[in-house]
Amino acid sequence: MPDYRSKTSTHGRNMAGARGLWRATGMKDEDFGKPIIAVVNSFTQFVPGHVHLKDLGQLVAAEIQAAGGVAKEFNTIAVDDGIAMGHDGMLYSLPSRDLIADSVEYMVNAHCADAMVCISNCDKITPGMLMAAMRLNIPVVFVSGGPMEAGKVKFRGDEKAIDLVDAMVVAADDSYTDEEVAEFERSACPTCGSCSGMFTANSMNCLTEALGLSLPGNGSIVATHANRKKLFLKAGQLIVELAKRYYEQNDASILPRSIATKAAFKNAMTLDIAMGGSTNTVLHLLAAANEAEVDFTMDDIDELSRRVPVLSKVAPAKQDVHMEDVHRAGGIMAILGELDRANLLDVSVPTVHEKTLKDALDKWDIIRTEDPDVYEFYRSSPGGVPTQVAFSQNRYYSTLDGDREKGVIRNAEHAFSKDGGLAVLYGNIALDGCIVKTAGVDESILKFTGSARVFESQDAAVEAILGNEIKAGDVVVIRYEGPRGGPGMQEMLYPTSYLKSKGLGKDCALVTDGRFSGGSSGLSIGHVSPEAAEGGAIGLVEDGDTIEIDIPNRTIHLNIDDATLAHRRTVQEAKGWHPKEERKRKVSKALKVYAMHTTSAAKGAVRVL
């Protein structure tokens, strides 16, 4: 028989007990010798992006069985960043990524699974499973639950598309009535699926397409559309094929580390920059590359950000455009197609579904293909009916958006900007770098000089913003919120949203060693490394200091002389690197363990053991 990993627990006289247990799960004589495929699901009723996944694992499992494999499903945890936002629950979000990676490793290795299908969707689940896939290096296919449909609200005479961030912004804006806020709240998230903009969840699901580990459409077709079911069915069929190619034909080219090479990681980052993806993707790609033992660093991201244009602007960068609009324009394969025509990709890299990325683009890029089935697939539209049920509608747009001059996806000649959607800044406040989502920054503040307002926690900053203590020209500095200092590196969606609601979105900057939600926009600079808790210079900033931000030249500078900075460091080191004011924050043993082993954001906040 083929030398499957699962043979360890299914063959030989000494494995009679293990086989007895396998039989108790439903396996028959004829199943021993087939590849055992782990169906790694993440269903939970806590998260709209995962609430519809309960039956989808068994949908995939049935296809695996029909294709000649043995499917065994298990579940991971899944944290909803939006629900965890703005309170101590957010401390658990980033650490959950590593816990998910570990739990997948534990289950797959403990039971000697041969391959896996990863059913993910939201912010830390796709990255956690991606890290596990790189770590385990067995055949894998990713398939996500898909984006939710954008909300629609009739507001003051006009109908507009909205999402979660709109509800947060209007809630803090006193010009909206309670009734109007309630209407936004009820309309913002109408269906199951990951939040409808180019936030972290959708960004990561798009990047799995560029990495070559998922099927076309994975990042863009809405969760409610019947055509999304095809991805799940195909994933079940494909994983058995990949398992047999590896174990029976000794074809290692289909393993995750053979597919997700440095060239593939650079392709993924190129896509991320071009589509203005979430800054969190930087953390997650660095972490996945670390697991894959690929030398992919902030320097690579910096180099790419200087030459890759912005080809698509989606909410929050362009509030009236959502993932359903990206799909109508050809989805991720269309953006990759434009990047290829601009000679910005390595299309020789393999994928799980085609021999090379070039082959995939020839088949799936709506500009170069003539396949009517592909056209129909990308015409899949929202249903417009609130639901928590997957594949529940089959509506289509009458036409595709193939306009590459003024459409949702542009070609390089007509790019939204020649400068990339993400940028790495360096300076005396961030020696190891920091990240800004330039696609969400107004051109008028690409260069900004302001006076520091320093806060030792996100909570204190929010209180000041809502209390009208922040004025135009301020640079809000939130520190001791990094991976170690938080611990857990909280997202700062509430501070950025509240600055918008106060009319300061284009008049202030926010700098933090924490991170930002994919829903954040504005001059929001995160991942400042080293973080304050590790002795970073952000811990030395004082109220009234001048901070100069120059995105075009990729710099951020604390405008004090070296001698003053050195004196402050000496004083701070004597006191210890901790917040100046005591925080009302309970740090559990689990979070303390995370803080003990995590590294800086510049390294993906991975653990060092």
Swiss-Prot record:
One of its GO terms (biological process) is isoleucine biosynthetic process. Keywords: 2Fe-2S, Amino-acid biosynthesis, Branched-chain amino acid biosynthesis, Iron, Iron-sulfur, Lyase, Magnesium, Metal-binding. It catalyses: (2R)-2,3-dihydroxy-3-methylbutanoate = 3-methyl-2-oxobutanoate + H2O; (2R,3R)-2,3-dihydroxy-3-methylpentanoate = (S)-3-methyl-2-oxopentanoate + H2O. Binds 1 [2Fe-2S] cluster per subunit. This cluster acts as a Lewis acid cofactor. [2Fe-2S] cluster binds at C122, C195. Its cofactor is [2Fe-2S] cluster; Mg(2+). The active site is at S517 (proton acceptor). Pathway: Amino-acid biosynthesis; L-isoleucine biosynthesis; L-isoleucine from 2-oxobutanoate: step 3/4; Amino-acid biosynthesis; L-valine biosynthesis; L-valine from pyruvate: step 3/4. Its EC number is 4.2.1.9. GO terms for cellular component: cytosol. The modification N6-carboxylysine is found at K124. Pfam families: ILV_EDD_C (PF24877), ILVD_EDD_N (PF00920). Disulfide bonds: none annotated. PANTHER family: D-XYLONATE DEHYDRATASE, D-XYLONATE DEHYDRATASE YAGF-RELATED. Belongs to the IlvD/Edd family. Functions in the biosynthesis of branched-chain amino acids. Catalyzes the dehydration of (2R,3R)-2,3-dihydroxy-3-methylpentanoate (2,3-dihydroxy-3-methylvalerate) into 2-oxo-3-methylpentanoate (2-oxo-3-methylvalerate) and of (2R)-2,3-dihydroxy-3-methylbutanoate (2,3-dihydroxyisovalerate) into 2-oxo-3-methylbutanoate (2-oxoisovalerate), the penultimate precursor to L-isoleucine and L-valine, respectively. Homodimer. This is Dihydroxy-acid dehydratase. It comes from Acinetobacter baumannii (strain SDF).
